[in-house]
Amino acid sequence: MEYQYPLDYDWSNEEMITVVKFYEAIERANEKGIVKEELMDLYRKFKQIVPSKAEEKKIDKEFQEVSGYSIYRTIQKGKDTEEHKIVKM
């Protein structure tokens, strides 16, 4: 899909790459499916960059507006999925 990911230009290039990989994982979970461990590992890395719940909610809202996918619902599904299984929305 072609849309602009929500990014904070105060993030370093490495942090932006990490966040974009996380967004791509959310897309995969919603489109094809992704192994739980991969999704949750990328979420942990995302949370190191965005530790604030308020900022995470803001980013989720912006991401959902451009992609149609909810970070929150996808991560909740990931948490509820058994180990080594595919997370698919």
UniProtKB/Swiss-Prot annotation:
Gene3D superfamilies according to UniProt: BH2638-like (1.10.220.80)
InterPro entries linked to this entry: BH2638-like_sf (IPR023324), UPF0223 (IPR007920)
Source superkingdom: Bacteria
SUPFAM superfamilies, sorted: BH2638-like
Pfam family, one: UPF0223
UniProt family annotation: Belongs to the UPF0223 family.
Official protein name in the record: UPF0223 protein Bcer98_2663
Annotated source species: Bacillus cytotoxicus (strain DSM 22905 / CIP 110041 / 391-98 / NVH 391-98)
